[in-house]
Curated annotation (Swiss-Prot):
GO terms for biological process: amino acid transport. Gene3D superfamilies: 3.40.50.2300. It comes from the Bacteria. Residues 1-22 form the signal peptide. This is Leu/Ile/Val-binding protein homolog 7. Component of an amino-acid transport system. Keywords: Amino-acid transport, Signal, Transport. Belongs to the leucine-binding protein family. InterPro entries: BCAA_transport (IPR051010), Leu-bd (IPR028081), Leu_Ile_Val-bd (IPR000709), Peripla_BP_I (IPR028082). SUPFAM superfamilies: Periplasmic binding protein-like I.
Length: 399
């Protein structure tokens, strides 16, 4: 990010960082418009439910939390909205952001102002790898995607195919933002460490409108397995054009994004997405004995929004926000020292949250207990197939 985009007056921002009323204002910074609006809005819904539940129990430090929205339609807008939330709205902290690019950009502004930034869904490495003191991430990150994908490929997918995983020809394709490049980099590393055969690694613009040449490249490489990191529009485009081009690999594995969305399956057709895999945050067709509180969240979501959750991103944001807000309720103030004290004390074991994973923030303010799950599209629904403790179905082969 260019330095001139974030050159701010530190004093001016810090002067505006204290709440101006008895209520505690918190920023809700997501892409509410533009190409990422669907998942941005879905993520924000989880935060909103968490805040409602916290407020119903007395709020945080005796005060109600009030969310102030910021529309991070792109990276520059994320910077501008972060400035506004801090210096005009006087927020005590910012929650976000779904998009890695937006999170990286906006969190620099927040760090400069000394205002905590709580990331609940973006996965790029650099969000918590830059040594920033006031940036925390509750969710899994890019490395976790890649590790789970390669593990599932070796332990579940290859055996189901009746193949040795080392005999498979694997292609890595990804949109070229921070999200795609971070996940792909780790996929390449884990594939190499496992001794697997990567025959192609290729990026593409996230806003591309034609992937037919990429489909031809995959065919030419003889790829048996395709690992795609993508948002919704490029997930839909690839699946459609692969189908139209008669390209049917033995397995397609998505890394969240569009592969976790019911609207993606509906757009391409359930027969087209059938048997495609997805590694992502916890989704809803899961063994709920491993995810206590998930069913209650779904009911709260339906009551508030009049429909079932559109993706597990709402659940991820809900669980992360509740853990953070409950921790902040145990300290006084929202300065850097108070936030560090609160989140350093968080210690939740796996199997105790609606996500299934636990919470403990490491030296980089990353939740080191966050983990992914493996899903597969079956009969138009995304169901959990890995790990075994969370699975509700065996994996299927494409017809």
């Amino acid at each position: 990010m260019e330095k001139h985009l974030i050159a701010l007056s530190v004093a001016a921002l810090q002067a505006g960082a204290a709440p101006a009323s008895a209520d505690i204002k918190m920023g809700s910074l997501y892409p509410f418009s533009g190409p990422l609006a669907l998942l941005g809005d879905e993520s924000a819904r989880g935060l909103e439910i968490a805040v409602e539940e916290i407020n119903a129990k007395g709020g945080v430090q005796g005060e109600k939390i009030v969310l102030v929205r910021g529309d991070a339609v792109d990276n520059n807008q994320a910077i501008g909205e972060a400035r506004r939330l801090i210096s005009v709205e006087n927020v005590a902290g910012i929650f976000g952001s779904f998009s890695s690019g937006r999170a990286v950009a906006a969190s620099q502004v927040s760090e400069l102002a000394g205002v905590p930034y709580f990331e609940l869904g973006a996965v790029a490495d650099e969000i918590t790898d830059r040594g920033l003191e006031n940036v925390y991430r509750a969710n899994p990150y890019a490395r976790d995607f890649a590790q789970m994908i390669v593990e599932m490929l070796q332990k579940k997918i290859a055996p189901k195919l009746g193949r040795d995983s080392k005999d498979l020809k694997i292609a890595v394709i990804y949109e070229d933002s921070s999200y795609g490049t971070s996940v792909a980099k780790h996929e390449e590393t884990f594939l190499k460490e496992a001794g697997l055969n990567m025959v192609l690694s290729q990026s593409y613009p996230g806003n591309t409108v034609d992937m037919s040449s990429l489909v031809l490249d995959l065919k030419s490489a003889g790829a048996d397995v395709v690992l795609q990191t993508s948002y919704q529009s490029d997930s839909v485009l690839f699946l459609q054009q692969a189908n139209e081009g008669g390209y049917k690999p033995s397995a397609i594995v998505g890394a969240g994004g569009g592969y976790s969305l019911q609207p993606t399956a509906d757009a391409v057709g359930h027969d087209v997405i059938e048997a495609a895999y997805d590694v992502d945050f916890t989704q809803f067709a899961v063994n709920t004995s491993f995810t206590p509180g998930l069913e209650e969240f779904v009911e709260a979501y339906k009551k508030k929004y009049g429909e079932t959750p559109r993706s597990g991103y709402s659940l991820t944001n809900y669980v992360g926000a509740k853990v953070i807000l409950e921790a902040l309720n145990k300290v006084k103030g929202f300065d850097a020292a108070a936030v560090k004290q609160a989140l350093s004390a968080v210690d939740i074991e796996a199997g105790k949250t609606a996500m299934g994973y636990g919470f403990k923030f490491d030296q980089n303010n990353q939740n080191e207990r966050a983990s992914m799950m493996g899903m597969q599209w079956q009969d138009g629904k995304l169901v959990t197939v890995y790990p075994d403790a969370a699975a509700i179905s065996e994996i299927r082969l494409p017809q």
